[in-house]
Amino acid sequence: MTADIRVSIDRGGTFCDVIAHVEGREPIIFKLLSVDPANYQDAPTEGIRRVLEIVEGKKIPVGEKLDGTRIASCRLGTTVATNALLEGKYEKFALVTTKGFEDVCVIGDQSRPKLFDLKVKKAEALHDTVIGVDERVTIEDYDLNPYPLDKSASLNDPDLVRTPSGEIIRILARVNEETVREQLLALRDAGYNSVAISFMHSYIFPDHEDQVAKIAREVGFTYVTTSAETRPVLKYLNRSTSCCSEACLYPVIRRYIENFESGFRVLPRRVDFMCSDGGLKQSQKFRGNEALLSGPAGGVVGIATSCYDVEQKIPIIGFDMGGTSTDVSRFDGKYDYLSETVIADRTISMPMLNISTVAAGGGSILFARSGLLVVGPESAGAHPGPACYRKGGPLTVTDANLFLGRLVVSSFPSIFGENADQPLDQDVVTAKFQEITADFNSQTSQNLTAEEVALGFLDVANEAMSRPIRNTTEARGFAPEKHNLVSFGGAGGQHACAIASKLGIKRVLIHKWSSLLSAHGISQADLQYESFEPLSLDFGMDLNGFIKERLSLLREKVAAGLLAQGAQESTLRFDESLVMKYFGTDTTITVTTPDDLDYGAAFEALHLREFAFKLNRKIVIDSVNVRGTGSAVTLATEEPPLKALARVKSVATTAQTTEEQKVYINGSWRKVPIYRLDQLSKGCAVSGPAMIIDKTQTIFVEPRFNAYILPDHVILEESNVEDTVTRQAVSAEEINPLLLSVFAHRFMSIAEQMGNTLQRTSVSSSIKERLDFSCAIFSREGKLVANAPHIPIHLGSMQMAIRYQHEAWKGKLKPGDALVTNHPLSGGTHLPDLTVVSPVFVNGDVAFYVASRGHHTDIGGKGIAAMMPESKELWEEGISIKTMKIVSGGEFLEDEIRAAFDKAGSFPGCSPTRRIADNLSDLKAQIASNQRGIILLGNLCEEFTLPVVCTYMEGIQANAEFAVRRFLKQLAKKHPEPLTAIDYFDDGTPIKIKIIIDPETGGAVYDFSGTGPQQWGNYNCPISITHSAIIYTLRCLVDVDIPLNEGCLTPIDIRVPYGSMLNPSPAVAICGSTLASQRVIDTILRAFRRCAASQGCASSFSWGMGGRDPETGKVLPGWNYGESLGGGVGALPGYHGESAINVHSTNTRNTDPEVVEKRTAVLVTKYAVRKGSGGRGQWRGGDGVTREIQARIPLKFSILSDRRVYRPYGMEGGEAGHRGQNYVFKFNQEGTGFEQINLGGKAVVVLNPGEKMQINTPGGGAWGKPEGDADGYREEDQAGDGI
């Protein structure tokens, strides 16, 4: 029997899409429900059964085993892995880690996903249990070493090993096989069948993992996964998470494949699965992580193979709008890959196509909140679904389209309602829109119609879906208008024209199978195989022979892998590349082998294009890669779409129809023609407004667009003819409340893109990895308009810095200028936070300001790092600048900024910065970030005019004020009495607050009278810190997504006595202010009685060497490193506090343990949750963390922390969290062991090689009395006042 059927299936969350190609006949396409247990057990098997019925012309009973003899290939994309990860439905497994790192996946990167949610929740670790193995290796040298080792020297020490990467590692502890066998047998006896093994530095030294894996197989584990096998890349956390993901998903995938294949009595000749990287893998070789973006990857391949015109080469943007979310991708002739991506709040290291997702789709719920129209991110899902589904669902984007006439009810089957036999419900949608319109009119004192409000919601939804497109294009230096938009997914056609218009895109391509494009992409995909080898080599042209040899070996491996999967040898194609970076950075660039083999020049050219600068540093090769593709079948090709368009346009006929429907467009109802796609002749044209419908989608052709019907596509092009109904102009005289959310999205998008630029172009780990930065835009008066959700402590303080610069430089700035500042008197928080401010000129005048603030780890001064425990006066803490021009007319003033940094080292006992190259590079990155903001604000003014943009900036600020006043009025009705609270720093200094709310106006006085005087120390807080604390707590308390800007503080009268700790004089030290801000926030929240205290600290932990020698005065070469540590979150009713995470004003990430050891001369010996440190209560406080670091050479360590005396308070009878503890372990006099010494909250200590420092951060307070009130519980445990 001839095998003449090729089936491609994409099993999505709601629908399973099927495309079957059969020789000699038209393709078979249809959809069926992904889950329908009443009618079939497995959707893909059912899809194949239906295909065979159609082809063979005979009935095949459901459930009968299928004969796949005629099926030449079966290709599948599946959400099985993603669903298992999201729903936690996977086989339990055990994690085996290096001893001391058992909690690495529990802690994660310590940043919280939702900045203003007091009920902090991070993704749970995937493993069920964990054991630590007493094995250990580390890297012998370190990147920051001013006296680097000679890696080419011979190795005589048996504990030193030169790895294939070129890196030398030291074995500190070898695997004890007998002990490990006992540990694994205990796990096996406990019922575990799957184990994940992840050891420190196994990406370059996998020997210990392989050793333990061999034992695991010997003792009977069925599934054994190692991190080096999963993905051998630097970063222990991400590699461990990826290993765990593979360990839990691989059994799920194997079972799924076995179940699928069990539905056949004769299997198809080939069964291949779609991988996240856009390639196919044979079912026997398909793994868990490869399945995570299986369906979306099919969509990217679909747009690339069906909508990218290989002749005209215009790049395309994929716009895949579904029910709950929208996926965005880009293709310019080459696929864009990511080496890691976040799925289900977990970072997975695995090559995947670059796909951005936004929580906005057809099922996104519509809200009217505080005078704003809000779309999502909540979704109605499939159940209950939109209101029109007759299941009691909420109003959604789909309902707005139905209400405005943009959906044709008769084109939907009658499958809705309790008995699944009713049409879409228009009546309930009308009633709900009238209800939400009345509410919105009440909030805004308007008299809008329901149609105007519904159209406003669609505008907001379109803007929300445009944001990821802007981030995919503009943020990377690509102009959106230079692209074609490819719309697919069930809902994309309704919004495609509007999205294109917002982005300035003139052409939209919609494939004939756009609602099944992922399945179509799967049908067009190639087999893929990738192999790479990690390296750590300084690039030089003399390495070309070595590189060629490594690539040749990898190419042979890739070819063998493809041929083993059945690829035809003649179809094999290879992409060879090096992954390269500048020394001391983490920004890698993949460099395809250039014709002249000068990888270095190619890298620098790509870096310059991507980031707009070069660095005067050596270049490092991170890895060599070979990716191969091949095909097992010969595929039919379609005519290039733009070629077909050119052929049709000149002879296009006007389509005819007798159907029409009223549609609400730009302020009025209009009769709009309806066309059935299957009845339109190829080569005809449709003028908008119109609707084109088929079995699976609706295309709304907006006014000013023409649709051309081609053999394989519908192409929508914007015409130059104005519609007879004039488009609504945006007035600068009066604010349209329907547009406020649209402008809020645009302003936020600009701030986000600034942040993306800063992270991508920065060099230091503080900004690039730990994300200790913020970006924002400001009005011409220096008032905050919008900031991306970065670091909360910067929220209210940056506007004070911009206002200071505005007043200082009024009338003196010119285009191309930029300023830098960090002084507390000019709106600074603490000196390491350097703020770069740029004016935005429009029509020759300053129209706005943009600013970026980044934490610089070394700014000179007395300490080993910028966060020094011992400082008493400001001059000791490093560079301090009230205002200074850093760029003049586009010229970077490097000499002046170097002189400013050098000046910081001229004071007694002070050193200049040890990392001036990093300082300069990061300042240039901040300038680049601002430049991105300048360009985007200029574009916005061109689109809407300057007066309109300024008007809506004021409108957004007024809206934030309205939301805060509304909240405070409601609170005052419930609690008319003043709100008071007091808390204490560890030295006994009180923080006191009284909040008096005016119930009529919603204004409030925040009075800090009674707060203690400024101290001879560094916990003094510039007044800008208090502003930040207030704006942050207000946003948390309002608990809805309101714009964060100047308007939030307009109702607030802030009174802080001068000379107090919260409004100090300019002479005192302030570097601990950002840590002290945690205590200010805790005190404000205590006054509102909202939650128990969180850790109240952000333990700033630093180490390094070099700087000015106190005896000789000579400045020695050196380096420093530092990080902030998370702790416990305070509980509140209905919520146990989260553990081991950053709280409130801080949200930086931690530095990965492997990165710490690769860069600095230390060992991370322990990183764990400090179990039991959270307060006990009805609702428990979260636990803190323990971070222990050992010196490998003589080093200076410092710790700056609080809550080492006063415990984080509990509420309503809940126990206080445990106070933090800082220890050093110094060798005893005999040298036989360690003496444990308590350091207190602030200390500097020099450690010899082998000595350790351990930081134990505080837990969070509990809420409500512990059950039984036993076990020594005392009243003072609630207050947190006991020492």
From Swiss-Prot:
Phenotype of gene-disrupted mutants: Does not affect the production of scytalone.
Molecular function GO labels: 5-oxoprolinase (ATP-hydrolyzing) activity; ATP binding
Gene assigned in the entry: PfmaA
Function, in words: 5-oxoprolinase; part of the gene cluster that mediates the biosynthesis of dihydroxynaphthalene (DHN)-melanin, a bluish-green pigment forming a dark layer in the conidial wall that protects the conidia from UV radiations. The first step of the pathway is the production of the pentaketide 1,3,6,8-tetrahydroxynaphthalene (1,3,6,8-THN or T4HN) by the polyketide synthase PfmaE though condensation of acetyl-CoA with malonyl-CoA. T4HN is not stable and easily oxidizes into the stable form flaviolin. T4HN is also substrate of the hydroxynaphthalene reductase PfmaG to yield scytalone.
The protein's name: 5-oxoprolinase PfmaA
InterPro entries: ACX-like_C, Hydant_A_N, Hydantoinase_A, Hydantoinase_B, Oxoprolinase-like
Listed EC numbers: 3.5.2.9
Family: Belongs to the oxoprolinase family.
